[in-house]
Amino acid sequence: MLNIDQQGLVVDKRVIKAISPAIERGPMNVVSGLIVHQTGGATAQSSLDSYKRVAANGAHFLIDKDGTIYQTASVKKQAWHIGKLKSRCMLEARCSVARKKLNAKFNPSLENKREMKKSAPDRFPSNKDAIGIELVGEALPRGAAIPNLPKLRARIHQHCF
């Protein structure tokens, strides 16, 4: 069980409090999702430092490569870690004809405004209702080639079976 105090902070000795007021925005009254990101940076400290900048963006939690968990914002406050929302019905191929026409022209700002009029789960979670978790690092180093999956599977199979 996760214990959360009145201020929205996790009460657990394994979670290091590193609250950055610059990333806390308005109140978050309901949580409809968890969004996991990768920082793209090499260290937790680089993210923690960036969270101190004026009008910084960041997530509620930061998990370092060694597993250290930092809480960087209250779970009772919004943290801006999500960009403009894309149309969920378009991505899931279930939009009405009228909605498809609205989304036919590429306009991220208008698409975001339309999506924000919806409630979750009819739209993706947003900054106003999602807890953000950032993992230090990136999926592949910048410039690295995307692995050939069939070849990778064959190598794994060869070594494991």
Predicted features, each with a name:
Residues L2-F161:
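Active-site-adjacent loop/helix surface patches within enzyme catalytic domains
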